[in-house]
Amino acid sequence: MSAGWRSWTGRPGGPGSAYGRLSPVQQSRPGYGGLRPGGLRPGGLRPGALRSGGMRPRSLWHRALARQSFLRHLDWALMLGVLGLSLLGTLLIWSATQHGLARAGGDPQTYLKKQLLNVVIGLILMAAVSSLDYRMLRIYAPVGYAITSIGLLVVLSPLGSIVNGAHSWIALPGGFQAEPSEFAKVTLILMVALILSELRDGDRRPRPRDLAAALACGALPLGLVVAQPDLGVLILMVAVLVGMIALSGIRLRWLAGLGAVTALAALVTWSLHLLKPYQVQRLTAFLNPSADPRGTGYSAAQAKIAIGSGGMFGQGLFHGSLVAGNFVPEQHTDFIFAVAGEELGFVGAIVIIGLIAVLLIRSLRIAVRADDQFGLLVASGIAIWFALQAFINIGMTIGITPVTGLPLPFVSYGGSAMFADMIAIGVLQAVHRRHSVFD
């Protein structure tokens, strides 16, 4: 074979080969841009094609290979769960809102368009985070934590707005609102993982000062959430914090002590009447649903009626009678699962639960296969978050958990929740891609 032909076959050393033009550092990177020695086959590229049009073929070639490599190393089973839930959620939101909007003389597709935009923006955020080396999140975590903490402070100022009795929102120009507590879930997980893994790449267990630092890190957002107050987010954050500490390798006696302190704090909160009256009423309504069926217990009672009326296969999408009459309060957000139960029936509800199970199984798999302790803790924290939030949301719809106002991940309407959920999926994909590329 002539030297001229060899230069265009992509073999190492050829002056015209793409591989030969890479720097020694680039050549040494495993899977750089998806390009390997011998990766360009004879006949696949012609010298004339590389020079035509005044383009930079090497950059285009590397960009195409990098894009192909990025897609190949995604966890597509995880993406199936996310896309399936997002699609079903968008349809259910449309069904839950179109009748009320039509009766009011508005556009029946208003919430459909908004949620589609939320999903698209969320997917863009997910792709951006997925493309990062997740170890760089060690650098970004403190910045994100500071920003979300400031946001939690702002909601308590005059810039914050009250929704359903809680100062959880920031009013933005154009009629938009942001809920910092949703993003605080992500940054809390990253910061706690950073603290508990910073010195854990060896075999040493976390020291008492590591545990104290993690608890102090959680205390700030937890205190600000209590001040709003948002009981659902508070329960979720405490569970995620305790779960991540438990998985960090902490000694059992410290874990038992932490559990005792958590239980004592809950008891003191209840005994000193630190909860708002409406929060106490929600808890008592859960314990005795028949105590106030037309007041505090109304939402949960109507949700159970809607689910029961769906039967095995449901009344059909867009044909739910209770949904059309808007008998279930907050049916496009907190009680979206009731819409699924009435219109899609038991089968549709099981499909949603199955997609959530796929998401959780893949998240745990990513955690187990993570390259380091930081990746394990981050993925585990996200798995705990999604599992508990889905359980609480579905549970309050069927009457086995109190009504707390937590949305169903990827299904309930909301921009802040969707963006935070998608960012979390991006972090999971980044952890997975790191393992997949170098496995």
Model-identified regions with their sequence ranges:
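A juxtamembrane structural motif centered on a specific transmembrane helix
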Residues: S2-P37, R41, R46-P47, R51-L65, ...
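N-terminal anchoring/assembly modules that precede and organize ATP-driven motor systems
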Residues: M55-R56, L71, L78-M79
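Helix-boundary and loop/linker segments of multi-pass membrane transporters
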Residues: Q68-R72, P206, D210-L211, G325-V328, ...
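Hydrophobic alpha-helical transmembrane segments of multi-pass inner membrane proteins, especially
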Residues: L78-S95, L101-S299, A338-I398, I423-V427
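Glycine/serine-rich anion-binding loops at beta->alpha junctions
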Residues: G174-A184, Q228-P229, G311-Q315, V403-A420
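Transmembrane helix boundary and interhelical junction motifs in multipass membrane proteins
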Residues: D230-I235, Q315-G320, Q331-T333, I350, ...
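TM-adjacent membrane-interface loops and short helices in multi-pass inner/ER membrane proteins
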Residues: A285-I336, F346-G348
